[in-house]
């Protein structure tokens, strides 16, 4: 779909937005109503915003609008009348006659559209529906709205499958029908949209899990001047980060540097079973810009690791017979951490008495620390799977970044058997940890299809990566990137979630670059690590250009 006109105030063509839970969106609607923008007026504006987006698209003359029983369908009825008044050929497909619609508001606007002469087809069989769709230039989906969850029931399941099979471009109103706007799950039939015009603000399900595959381009329609303030008053559950927000964490380009001023990183990782994890993490830290990387590994694998990383000093420390860290390694590791700007612990360590002792020692140190992979599993063992009930473990005088995927996160908060299965659930679990701690020195990076960087004050959602990141060792690369960024930050930096989010975006860009070389299914962790340096440059250049452009826009004209 291509658009031919600039956006009006009713449509905001940006991705970066506060994200509200569905129940809080209802509170925003009620708040706007109290400020004089009634629910019926919001429906009128929502339908108008959807119609406005359709009218921006090129080569669209005939529009099929599929409506449901509720207010989402009401938006579609409003859009039908607006489009017809602008000369479009419009056909509304409804499950019932207008007078049989249960929602009072939707019934009123449906009757209005009927009185205006909009063509209405009620409950067509699949063959007739396919004929309507095939003769249309675009489908406007207004069947199931933000209150939907579960699997679509007839006739909507059949209609959804028919729309997807028709091959006609689709614009969804608020949310693609069949998708949960809260969880991002779509267990049954679900519209695959080319664009989604969502009202008031983003919802978690639009940007996570199946939502990423079915929403297409997302356009937010604020609908009212008061919306921004009202959304903020309802405490967004998360925030999508825009590139310009990274200006404070982008390192200025200067030749007045040395290897230590770029930050020194210690990586404590590896075992005889997983030596590659240490290699991936250390290489990623170096590629991400750390000037000096030291790798501490069990002495039994040190020669093997050193052959893989000739540029990185490899320190072999005390090991058990099974090739894992011994508790006796703690003094050496703590001394190395004391000399480093930041430390990463966990990749490939395994979970043993010795590794638990090493992780515990580092947690109790004053080293800025990133804990990943088995380091997190060691933390789970230290706290009996309830890190949120042991805030003294994470309450320290130095930055601490935890980078769990959903299963690791579940093990940390007593949900090992039922790990978080959505962005919403991951946010809730991560907040149990950071709110128990209560300090600004802790950030939980809840990795998933939509990764959340959760601090005590806010949860940030970086631009997500592609499926190329779903490969063994990819998380080790991310841990190295975040540790390198942490190492070069000033001591007084307070926004750990923003640093972590930038690291996630570097990781995503590196994965995309690797996919161009090896294919989306052929990428290995080492390929991602090799692209990290160029990914950092690409993102930093983009951020710098945005900041420079914004500065030029603010300069007074002569």
Model-derived regions, located:
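Small-residue (G/A/S/T)-rich helix-start motifs and N-terminal tracts that mark the onset
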Residues: 2-95, 102, 195, 206-373, ...
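Short acidic loop-to-helix transition motifs that present clustered carboxylates
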Residues: 125-128, 177-181, 204-205, 375-378
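Short, solvent-exposed loop/turn segments at secondary-structure boundaries
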Residues: 104, 151-152, 184-185, 414-417
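Short, flexible loop segments at the rims of nucleotide/cofactor-binding pockets, characterized by
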Residues: 116-121, 147-151, 319-324, 347-350
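Internal gly/pro-rich beta-alpha loop/helix module
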Residues: 137-138, 143-236
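Nucleotide and nucleotide-moiety/phosphate-recognizing core
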Residues: 52-143, 149-173, 357-360, 365
């Amino acid at each position: 779909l291509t658009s031919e006109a600039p956006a009006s105030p009713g449509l905001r063509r940006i991705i970066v937005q506060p994200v509200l839970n569905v129940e809080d969106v209802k509170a925003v609607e009620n708040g706007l109503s109290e400020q004089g923008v009634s629910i019926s007026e919001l429906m009128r504006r929502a339908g108008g915003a959807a119609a406005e987006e359709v009218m921006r698209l090129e080569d669209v003359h005939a529009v099929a609008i599929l409506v449901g029983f509720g207010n989402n369908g009401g938006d579609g009825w409003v859009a039908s009348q607006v489009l017809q008044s602008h000369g479009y050929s419009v056909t509304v497909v409804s499950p019932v006659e207008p007078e049989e619609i249960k929602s009072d508001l939707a019934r009123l606007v449906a009757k209005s559209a009927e009185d205006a002469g909009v063509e209405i087809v009620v409950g067509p069989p699949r063959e007739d529906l396919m004929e309507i769709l095939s003769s249309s230039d675009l489908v406007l989906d207004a069947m199931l709205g933000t209150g939907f969850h579960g699997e679509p029931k007839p006739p909507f399941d059949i209609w959804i499958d028919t729309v997807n099979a028709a091959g006609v471009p689709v614009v969804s109103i608020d949310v693609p029908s069949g998708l949960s706007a809260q969880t991002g799950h779509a267990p049954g039939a679900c519209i695959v949209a080319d664009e989604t015009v969502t009202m008031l603000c983003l919802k978690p399900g639009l940007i996570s899990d199946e939502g990423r595959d079915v929403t297409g381009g997302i356009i937010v329609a604020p609908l009212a001047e008061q919306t921004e303030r009202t959304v903020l008053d309802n405490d967004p559950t998360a925030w999508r980060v825009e590139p310009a927000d990274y200006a404070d964490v982008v390192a200025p380009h200067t030749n007045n540097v040395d290897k230590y001023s770029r930050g020194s990183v210690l990586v404590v990782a590896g075992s005889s079973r997983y030596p590659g994890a240490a290699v991936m993490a250390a290489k990623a830290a170096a590629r991400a810009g750390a000037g000096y990387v030291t790798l501490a590994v069990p002495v039994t694998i040190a020669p093997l690791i050193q052959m893989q990383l000739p540029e990185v000093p490899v320190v072999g420390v005390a090991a058990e017979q099974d090739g894992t860290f011994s508790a006796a390694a703690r003094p050496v590791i703590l001394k190395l951490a004391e000399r480093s700007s930041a430390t990463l612990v966990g990749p490939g360590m395994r979970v043993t008495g010795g590794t638990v002792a090493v992780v515990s020692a580092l947690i109790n140190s004053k080293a800025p620390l990133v804990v990943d992979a088995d380091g997190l599993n060691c933390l789970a063992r230290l706290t009996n799977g309830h890190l949120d009930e042991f805030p003294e473990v994470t309450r320290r005088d130095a930055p601490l970044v935890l980078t769990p995927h959903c299963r690791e996160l579940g093990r940390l908060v007593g949900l090992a058997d039922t790990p978080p299965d959505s962005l919403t659930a991951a946010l809730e679990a991560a907040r149990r940890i950071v709110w128990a701690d209560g300090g600004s020195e802790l950030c939980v990076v809840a990795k998933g299809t939509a990764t959340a960087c959760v601090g005590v004050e806010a949860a940030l959602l970086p631009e997500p990566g592609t499926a190329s990141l779903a490969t063994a060792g990819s998380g080790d690369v991310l841990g190295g990137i975040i540790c390198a960024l942490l190492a070069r930050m000033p001591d007084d930096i307070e926004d750990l979630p923003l640093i972590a989010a930038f690291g996630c975006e570097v990781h995503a860009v590196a994965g995309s670059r690797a996919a161009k070389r090896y294919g989306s299914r052929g990428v290995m962790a080492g390929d991602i690590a090799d692209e990290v340096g160029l990914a950092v440059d690409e993102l930093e250049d983009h951020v710098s250009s945005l900041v420079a452009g914004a500065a030029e826009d603010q300069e007074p004209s002569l």
